[in-house]
Amino acid sequence: MTQKKNKKRRSGLAPALLLGLLLGLAGDAWLQLNTPLAISHPDAVELESGQRLSSLSRQMDERGLFASARQRLYLIAYARLHGEAAQLKAGEYALEPGLTPLGLLTTLTSGKTMLHELRLVEGWRFAQAWKLIQADPNLSHTLESADPAAIMQAIGRPGLNPEGRFFPDTYRFPKRTTDVAFLRNAYTAMDKVLAAEWTGRAPDLSYKSPDQALTMASLVEKETGAPNERPIIAGVFLRRLQLGMRLQTDPAVIYGLGEAYDGNIHTEDLRTDTPYNTYTRDGLPPTPICLPGREAIHAALHPDGGKALYFVAKGDGSHQFSDNLEDHNAAVMKYQINKPHLHP
């Protein structure tokens, strides 16, 4: 009888021990899954397309990002048990101090990847913007040629000159975005801004197309950085065109000189004919000369209604505007020939 009772006692003890073991394991798993990872400062991890959690977690473990080996194993088991291992989304994710394994899993299945920034600056030439894009390590570089025609072909706009076609702004994008996708986004942004400004343009302007307005905006962008002067300069240029006067704007001449420009504009440069020399040719240049910002585009389509036909730089970032040549020559003498000493 005693032996039978002992056998029953032992057979009843085994399930209890197993239950206790499972409860202890579950408790330890819960503790580990809710214990912060070993992240002491903001970091990042990249999950490649098709990569499994076991592979990613191994990479993280090699970087010392798990508080313990058990923490990593529990994470893998939990993800598989709850079907989340198959829901991971590729991309680069931010890791912040205090993040737990469960929080990591939520992050990896959210698709909310890190965004990188790249700024295209108002007044830049396309060549400057392209150089910056090519150098960005977070973009995927797929364009083998830097030829403008090939670039425009790649973004689906064959035959267009890229100058002025990409909106200057700060763009945010996930890692491995292609250079083509980035350029297409910037092109679309400019398209939308130009279309909106063209729709709301002032009446009775002499532009034949939005493209002409974009070219004018690029001249305005290069001539001044003072917001209040942009519509005034646009007004000067439009009045000169209406009167059959040449624009005589130095930034266009400089653009036409290309690499021949040595940092100073000379009398000979003004006489050297290029498609962009507005001293030797009538009308607008054939294309924009830079990436104009929205303010410059708005100014080109909402010009000042004054009478000024001339302007000269005063040396302090602003300009002196004149209605006639006599006053303009006097302003040139004052601000260019006899340059005043400007105090900051």
Indicate residue ranges for each PLM-predicted region:
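Conserved catalytic or metal-liganding residues and their short signature motifs at active sites
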Residues: 1-248, 290-295, 299-307, 315-344
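Histidine-acidic residue clusters that define the catalytic metal-binding segment
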Residues: 280-289
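Small-residue-rich helix-loop
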Residues: 227-280
